[in-house]
């Protein structure tokens, strides 16, 4: 009995050490795969629309085109942000009707490290900036001019995903008025698409 009792703790310790080594191995493998997944994602892209990289350059483009800057403040751990990105902002960014024509759309990851050029050219930390703007409750959507000033009501959270694009249209029209831009969007993306098609059809064809 004494021999058996003396061997059990030793066996347990060896097994425990083996499990610890396996756990450390799996943890290292997990973080390696996570790092690879992050590095494999295109730089400056969040999901399917662009991550904000330079406020100063974006502000210059906004002033030149008289287009509002639309920023969605989000984070990797925010499930509602992912829903909003996938169902609303990614289709708007990829559809060809909005980016550079109706607005300048960017994602602002408040959990991203480092700094970017601010509207004044000075280093800007996204997390600190979000806190200062009161946009650290994600998702929060802001409408800014080329100087970084809010020019339309912000949208905090998601009240109704089906009506969200119409809400963006409404706020964009408010922003256009502040910017002196005569552009006005109809209530829905479908009507906006029809509007663009009608404008294209009314343009004179190029002569051969």
Language-model-detected regions and their locations in the chain:
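Bacterial N-terminal signal peptides that target proteins for export
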Residues: 4-24
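Bacterial N-terminal signal peptides
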Residues: 22-32
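Boundary at the C-terminal end of the N-terminal hydrophobic targeting segment
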Residues: 35-39
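A short beta-strand-turn-helix
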Residues: 50-68
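Short active-site neighborhood of thiol/selenol oxidoreductases, capturing the structured segment around
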Residues: 65-78
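Conserved helix-turn-beta segment immediately C-terminal to the redox Cys motif
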Residues: 67, 86-108
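Short, thiol/selenol-centered motifs that function as redox-active sites or metal-ligating centers
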Residues: 75-89
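Non-catalytic, surface beta->alpha helical segment in thiol-disulfide oxidoreductase systems
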Residues: 131-132, 136-177
